[in-house]
From Swiss-Prot:
Region ranges (G1): 440-447
Extent of Low complexity compositional bias: 57-68, 77-117, 141-153, 180-198, 224-233
Family label: Belongs to the TRAFAC class translation factor GTPase superfamily. Classic translation factor GTPase family. IF-2 subfamily.
Ranges of Pro residues composition bias in the record: 118-136
Organism of origin: Nocardioides sp. (strain ATCC BAA-499 / JS614)
Protein name (record): Translation initiation factor IF-2
Primary role: One of the essential components for the initiation of protein synthesis. Protects formylmethionyl-tRNA from spontaneous hydrolysis and promotes its binding to the 30S ribosomal subunits. Also involved in the hydrolysis of GTP during the formation of the 70S ribosomal complex.
Residue ranges, annotated region (G5): 580-582
Keywords for this protein: Cytoplasm, GTP-binding, Initiation factor, Nucleotide-binding, Protein biosynthesis
Amino acid sequence: MAKTRVHELAKEFGVESKFVLEKFKEMGEFVKSASSTVELPAEMRFRKEYGEKLKAEASAAPAAPAEKPAAKKAPAKKAAATAEPEALAAEPAAEPAAAEAPAAAEAEAPAAKAAAPKPGPKPAPVAEQPAPPAEPEAPEAPEAPAASAAPAAPKAPAPRPVGRPGAPRPGNNPFASSQGMGRRPAPGAPAAPGAGDNRPPRPPAAREGGVPGRPGMPRPNPAMMPKSPSAFGAGPGGRGPARPGAPGRGGAPGRGGAPGRGGVGTGAPGRGGAPGGGFGPSGGGRPGGGRPGQRGQTQGAFGRPGGPSRRGRKSKRARRQEFEAMEAPTIGGIRVRKGNGETVRLPRGASLTDFAERINVEPAQLVQMLFSLGEMVTATESVNDETLELLGEELNYVVEVVSPEDEDRELLESFDIEFADDEDDEGHFEARPPVVTVMGHVDHGKTKLLDALRHANVASGEAGGITQHIGAYQVHTDVDGEDRKITFIDTPGHEAFTAMRARGSQSSDIAVLVVAADDGVMPQTVEALNHAKAAGVPIVVAVNKIDKPEADPTKVRGQLTEYGLVPEEYGGDTMFVDVSAKSELNLDKLLEAVVLTADASLDLRANPNRDAQGLVIEAHLDRGRGPVATILVQRGTLHVGDSIVAGPAHGRVRAMLDEYGNELTEATPSRPAMVLGLSTVPGAGQNFIVVEDDRMARQIAEKREARERAAMQAKRRVRRTLEDFMASMEKGESQELNLILKGDVSGSVEALEDALAKIDVGDDVSLRVIDRGVGAITETNVDLAAASDAIIIGFNVRPQGKATELADREGVEIRYYTVIYQAIEEIEAALKGMLKPEFEESTLGQAEIRAIFRSSKVGNIAGCMVISGVIRRNAKVRVIRDGAVVADNLDLASLKREKDDASEVREGFECGLVLRNFQDIKEGDIVEAFEMREIPRA
């Protein structure tokens, strides 16, 4: 299903796309344009917040067309309103004359061509200056309106409004028609608020050819501005008459007639009817023209600016930013704004780009800072939590990495979904079966006990007789004539399956702790007990194997009392049942104890009339049916055809099967079922939820997959510092064992990876799991192993297709295992074999030099007596004189017994030897022979 676009939403609610974009911006959603798509959570939020309001406004929309004509006149009203305060402030009595001005100007337009403008009354001068000379008559100047004949009281210029946008500064473009010096504003432009004009606006004259000018707008009058000393000589000047045949613009007196505007008149033919366009003193501004308070403008095409630019006062925000930049810490030559100790929330596996967006800095700055701190990280690379916390501490930020639970909850809340929401109406609750987890030490009979309860033989199907999967079953029992259902979850007992036991205890209501009567309490028994206590579930103890001769149930009760499980017969509150799974003894009493504990301690009710939510117990990849997930419904009812999302997997439920392979149409609370139809294999222990449609399920799954991938990359990334890099360059590359794990179920793969991660054989050898998955070994796995020099570990799986041939051709090793501890032992041995060998010195013997024979051919020959051990020909020797080592790590050039060469000479025999490259020997020196022996690495 395609995503909704912004313009589609706007069309649906009858508003403009701009309005929808603004609302998304207020909501904090980044939407670029009207054609951009909108994610489903953002669309739902928009509909929830603005949908009803927009629909209500749309229902009242028919009254809007009547107001459209008035809306079109708004600009004219606005312009009139702008000029109205000035006209009222100048002279209220001039309003009737100003109203009649357009008609008078229209009647006198033909006569205006030959008539000179009548000078209006001048305001009182602000500063004493010589009066300007009389204006020359302009041939195209219009006749003054009647309103100008009435003198108005002079008034001081009104203060300029704060924040008035200034005119754009002209550039140094020599090809422009005007550079802005003494440039007349366009006809019809609104008057400047601070112009100080105390006369009503002069109506525009008719254009040549009888074409009327633009509607009369108040024209700025520089003559009424305060005068300033001129940089140039004051004098009349004009732009000259208009070109023949060219209609000139308005007939108002030009700037040349204003005091201080005349001077260097160009006289070039230009716009007609506006004398005085030359350079001159600007009224109230700096040399170079412009309004009062405006920046200096250019004097020529490539000339200097008209004066020093006045820099405005900096705002508080600008000053604060400059101060923060000066106070920012400098790390590795990079200056970054320092935080105030605020908390920055980041997801797992976040990159430096994510961190930079939170604190409003450039990612490249953080990359350089980490490089100076000894970490080589790219801007888009997933970074582990320690690195983010280190960087945040340097910048005075508290980095809080969001936990996976909070991360998933925030994701679901963005789709208006709440997991584990039990705040339903009490009237909708119905009783559900208890969920019981069977836990205990390995080989204490947990699976055998479940086989006896459900009359099956699961233990025979497990490799080595050890449960390596989580199984979920539902059995029926008769308690006081009532048929009761109990859901059992079987967990492995091996130490490598700690996480699977923890998942089992957290998803159950009651824990059945199985303890063998002959072995007693074992390490995994205590661990399972701690998991059950941490989950806060009641415990029922099943003392198994009581039919064996060496069984001692009393000893088991005494041992468990030390861990806080006091039997009822001892005055406690824990039920103990002596059973035998092999003989099927007292199994009914165990089921009755489970039901009584559930009725007495728990309120087992759920709402079946809602969308299903629950837990993925186990998942695997079936060759014929695809991904198969064993789920446990915790609330609601799951139906065939529901859209479901479980971790990174999503899809529609195509079929449901029970533990016996029978098809189910629905799964009620506490009902385990196998679900078919998912896109991929979900992780064991992940939650599943039913959503509205496939589109929402796909979006949730994709976001989860992206977050898991980022977290996995940050977890796998080897922290490589500059010091480590330099050291590895000096002494050679360190050894690294790359593995690819493939298993039959996701829980076993997870347990194997966790167990391998705990193997520690030193810093010289490292273990890296580059890929893991569920299902058969494929050619893709072999290609990856060949490219990364990895070994493939297959746990209860075999190669598929031509993967074996490809592995033989590429030289990739594939190891197969069915029991987890065999894989752990062999991989640990392989890691130890990759270690660099360690050597220790072993002393072989000593010989005393009794005589020295000199030979011109071989040098000094030492005649020795072996006083201890043995002297070997290929051994290393050292020379000791008076207890001090004179020479060390020497080779024997020759060793003879009498005249024959000898490989070794034992204690009590004489020999002659020659030391290679050492002749400084004396009688009485001790020659000690030794060798370096390799010792195994522990």
